[in-house]
Amino acid sequence: LNAAEALVRWDHPTLGSIPPGDFIGLAEETGLIGPIGEFVLRQACWQACEWQRQGLEPIRVSVNLSVHQLRQGKLVSLVRQVLEESGLEPRYLELELTESQLLDSVEHIISTFQQLRELGVKLAIDDFGTGYSSLSYLKRFPVDYVKIDQAFIRGLGEGTEDAAITQAIIAM
């Protein structure tokens, strides 16, 4: 095990566990995405440090971002504060933004990502292949990882067109 991803679920009293795809849009519309995102970031960093305190090897913990969190302009200071408070080394934190979200506020995202990289945080583009970005567009973003969408990965062993596309991306 070399990495883990923090995933939030809404534990609804009557509907049970609700996946993020079913409530993140509402959280963004109502302004709750900021507090939810901060909670997830804090919990992920704390848990990664807790595992280290228990004697486990350090692992990278990944947290998904919403473009709304980036727009607020407080993300870099929040990440810096959480890293200091938790004691997690920045290299063990990875922040992810989906490819489709990169199309919004491009220059602001690039600037924020550059500042986060200066802190030592790892950055990733998630769900690559689901948006309409060209590779020349994506290379503008200072990221450490590009995570290919699982829809492409599923067809890898079957000789499908998805497999050909995925292999071409990996070869680059």
Where are the model-predicted features located?
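Cyclic nucleotide signaling catalytic output domains
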Residues: D22, L26, Q43, S62-V67, ...
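The catalytic core of metal-dependent phosphodiesterases that act on cyclic dinucleotides
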Residues: A3, L7, R80-L156, I170-M172
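Flexible loop/coil segments at beta-strand boundaries within sensory signal-transduction domains
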Residues: P13-L15, Q54, Q115
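Active-site core of bacterial EAL-family cyclic-dinucleotide phosphodiesterase domains
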Residues: L1-L26, N64, E96, I125
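Catalytic-site-adjacent helices and loops of nucleotide signaling machinery
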Residues: G16-P20, E29, I125-L138, D162
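Catalytic core of bacterial c-di-GMP phosphodiesterases, primarily the EAL and HD-GYP domains
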Residues: L1-E5, T30-H108
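Conserved long alpha-helical elements within nucleotide-processing catalytic cores of c-di-GMP signaling
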Residues: I18-G25, G34, I110, Q114, ...
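Catalytic strand-loop-helix junctions within cyclic-nucleotide turnover domains
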Residues: D11-L15, Q69-R71, L156-G157
